[in-house]
Amino acid sequence: MLLAVLLLLPLPSSWFAHGHPLYTRLPPSALQVLSAQGTQALQAAQRSAQWAINRVAMEIQHRSHECRGSGRPRPQALLQDPPEPGPCGERRPSTANVTRAHGRIVGGSAAPPGAWPWLVRLQLGGQPLCGGVLVAASWVLTAAHCFVGAPNELLWTVTLAEGSRGEQAEEVPVNRILPHPKFDPRTFHNDLALVQLWTPVSPGGSARPVCLPQEPQEPPAGTACAIAGWGALFEDGPEAEAVREARVPLLSTDTCRRALGPGLRPSTMLCAGYLAGGVDSCQGDSGGPLTCSEPGPRPREVLFGVTSWGDGCGEPGKPGVYTRVAVFKDWLQEQMSASSSREPSCRELLAWDPPQELQADAARLCAFYARLCPGSQGACARLAHQQCLQRRRRCELRSLAHTLLGLLRNAQELLGPRPGLRRLAPALALPAPALRESPLHPARELRLHSGSRAAGTRFPKRRPEPRGEANGCPGLEPLRQKLAALQGAHAWILQVPSEHLAMNFHEVLADLGSKTLTGLFRAWVRAGLGGRHVAFSGLVGLEPATLARSLPRLLVQALQAFRVAALAEGEPEGPWMDVGQGPGLERKGHHPLNPQVPPARQP
């Protein structure tokens, strides 16, 4: 082990100096890798900060819209029977390919704007992951596997269909996620989930729902049905920039069994496509629609399948697999029916303003917690109110925890594919908490192929803060204060010009006499960002595997140090600021490893 350290790092010529433990610096090549990863972490931090601000700005926009419409904001759960946005299943005609098997979505053809008014896009922290289908004014149907590892509704938004004239699509927060209770992520059995929108779709807007089947069976085999989505153009390829569409024939159960083997569960799955290959859904299309036309004076589209999984994309003999919607009709109707027996969502509780909320509204919101209360009505109401407050506090912590985990995950994800890091640490592993929470699984899951990947990251453009008086709109002013607080807290990263958004590690000085049981050494770190310099203590590995393991924490410490330095920028600290991390913080100006040996600076 000592030999590996000597080979990796140039050590001083003597082991001891004046009785003090020996120090060693990471070589310039390692500092370059650290700097590159630090810059990527800064970019991820800036995007995460912008997303947090966008989320609150979006809440303000929707709160203002609700106040203008009804004079008072109401959580979505208190809205009863919102009007449906027009007749279901009606769409503009298009030229989707019906007979030839050369198209893909994976290929297909570009759909004209507004051709699929029920097609929506689900985004996690601004990153598009799955498709979905609007089935009612407040409900979207999608695949349950989209939410494996990411069940927090506060992190999701839904982008509605754009208009036929190319109007900008509306982005709506998610209020509730209801995966089917019997969904099995190993077999994709019952791969279905309902998503409740925070605000219902406007009746006059471009989005309208698809029709749900009235009978528990699908059209006969051979029926040409439509698929649409933004998914990959080929397996492991880039996602489509615009909606693409194609038509695929329904296949018989026997044909599907022969093609797909025991992985197919006919009770809840159907398959569609050409056995010759070529036309199929792909990664990113998960949760999207498989619709078939219902003949009549006014033809309409009926949703018979939700994109679930496949063996590759458009490969010969491997049709796509869809969750059968018809067999879940009763469950869908039950979940979409307004009911006070459902526990309030985190978004409803976070929008609730206990000091200002009307008593009747609070009672309706918290009624779930009074269901099994054996006491008097007054005592049960007080108990329900207290439980509402307790869950609200848990939701606040949950939101904060997911935001912090997301920041750490973004920094970690940027470490793996870098050539310099592969040279130093070929086996970088995510910490267990981040791994368990990671939502970046393949969308339109390729169960039989391990090389699939999710679509690229995209973040929503910053929305302007809606203007208007808060009078008569309770809860709007606290949201504006929260927005101002977020803007202030993240100003340190948002105000850094893009040309200066680069982290430079100047020195990492490790104490060879401080090795821990995990193989890490205590180190003194100096780094710079846009003319601002910080110094802090941390733990670093000197071998490839331990160095890789210590990088995520080191980068998070650097981000925290730059934030603290920015907040204290007006204090007379000089060009360097000591921001010790973790236990045993040292006084400013003192070397954390040896008070008598100041850290040498590189030229």
Swiss-Prot record:
Expressed neural retina, cornea, sclera and optic nerve. Residues 1-19 form the signal peptide. SUPFAM superfamilies: Trypsin-like serine proteases. The active site is at 145 (charge relay system), 191 (charge relay system), 286 (charge relay system). GO terms for biological process: blood coagulation; camera-type eye development; proteolysis. It comes from the Eukaryota. InterPro entries: Peptidase_S1_PA, Peptidase_S1_PA_chymotrypsin, Peptidase_S1A, Trypsin_dom, TRYPSIN_HIS, TRYPSIN_SER. GO terms for cellular component: endoplasmic reticulum; extracellular space. Residues 105-337 form the Peptidase S1 domain. CDD domains: Tryp_SPc (cd00190). Pfam families: Trypsin (PF00089). Glycans are attached at residue 97. One of its GO terms (molecular function) is serine-type endopeptidase activity. Disulfide bonds join 130-146, 225-292, 256-271, 282-313. Residues 64-96, 442-474, 573-603 are annotated as: Disordered. Its EC number is 3.4.21.-. Keywords: Disease variant, Disulfide bond, Glycoprotein, Hydrolase, Microphthalmia, Protease, Serine protease, Signal. Belongs to the peptidase S1 family. Serine protease required during eye development. PANTHER family: ACROSIN-RELATED, SERINE PROTEASE 56. It is linked to Microphthalmia, isolated, 6: A developmental ocular disorder characterized by small malformed eyes. Clinical features are extreme hyperopia due to short axial length with essentially normal anterior segment, steep corneal curvatures, shallow anterior chamber, thick lenses, and thickened scleral wall. Palpebral fissures appear narrow because of relatively deep-set eyes, visual acuity is mildly to moderately reduced, and anisometropic or strabismic amblyopia is common. The fundus of the eye shows crowded optical disks, tortuous vessels, and an abnormal foveal avascular zone. This is Serine protease 56. It comes from Homo sapiens (Human). The lineage of its organism: Eukaryota, Metazoa, Chordata, Craniata, Vertebrata. The gene is PRSS56.
